[in-house]
Amino acid sequence: MRIIKYLTILVISVVILTSCQSSSSQESTKSGEFRIVPTTVALTMTLDKLDLPIVGKPTSYKTLPNRYKDVPEIGQPMEPNVEAVKKLKPTHVLSVSTIKDEMQPFYKQLNMKGYFYDFDSLKGMQKSITQLGDQFNRKAQAKELNDHLNSVKQKIENKAAKQKKHPKVLILMGVPGSYLVATDKSYIGDLVKIAGGENVIKVKDRQYISSNTENLLNINPDIILRLPHGMSEEVKKMFQKEFKQNDIWKHFKAVKNNHVYDLEEVPFGITANVDADKAMTQLYDLFYKDKK
């Protein structure tokens, strides 16, 4: 009987101890003791808006939130340093779905689950903001951010809908030495549509395509947008040289009417980001500045 009583007490003690440990673990998670490492700038900026601490940040020439100034860098978004990340003992390492295939070997070396979020469009980013809010106990902050973005988007769409004519827009995305043409599937293409512009490129299955200037002239857009991706000053000079030396550009309606605009990486960029409110507003003002 004594043995049975002893074993009963022992089992109860183990159950209570396990329950306490489980409860403690849950409370720890609820209190936000996550060790988060975002691998892209867009994710880093989003986590800042959600008032979340991080233990690692991507290496970037872009200005990151001041609250993260002392956070260790972990390398470029496409090539994070595995050992640098491991040292941080993260619970979550975050990336974006656009580069999911490229990031799989990285997560395999980390021996961790990969968390991927859609930042290809405003709608995709807003869904990701909700997911992050649910995942890291920031539902109120996520709702507030999405409500603000929805409010600005609705305001811009309503104003654009009242315009009698919508400009035809060509979007060039430049990197040092070359450029591509952006479609509606790209983030910048999505913003142009929201702001009331009509993308002259009708490709539906790719974000960016190559195209020669002769074909583009046949489309003859009202407005040309030039967006740099990395080394923005060098890309601006490249575009200026291209438009000056390639004689065909002078025949474009947009060039003749001085409707060629160089966009800044902030608030634009090639992936969705929390500065989308400013980007939508700037595009609308460019498209309809003569109709205010």
UniProtKB/Swiss-Prot annotation:
Gene3D superfamilies: Nitrogenase molybdenum iron protein domain. Induction: Repressed by fur in the presence of iron. Heme binds at V41, A42, S60, Y61, M78, H229. A lipid is attached at C20 (S-diacylglycerol cysteine). It holds the Pfam family Peripla_BP_2. InterPro entries: ABC_Transporter_SBP (IPR050902), ABC_transptr_haem-bd_IsdE (IPR019957), ABC_transptr_periplasmic_BD (IPR002491). It is found in: Cell membrane. Residues 35-291 form the Fe/B12 periplasmic-binding domain. It is a lipid-anchor. The keyword Transit peptide does not apply. Keywords: Cell membrane, Heme, Iron, Lipoprotein, Membrane, Metal-binding, Palmitate, Signal, Transport. A lipid is attached at C20 (N-palmitoyl cysteine). The keyword ATP-binding does not apply. Involved in heme (porphyrin) scavenging. Binds Fe(2+) and Fe(3+) heme but the largest fraction is Fe(2+) heme. Functions as a high-affinity heme binding protein and probably has a role in relaying heme-iron from cell wall-anchored isd proteins receptors to the probable permease IsdF. Belongs to the bacterial solute-binding protein 8 family. This is High-affinity heme uptake system protein IsdE. It comes from Staphylococcus aureus (strain MRSA252). The lineage of its organism: Bacteria, Bacillati, Bacillota, Bacilli, Bacillales. The gene is isdE.
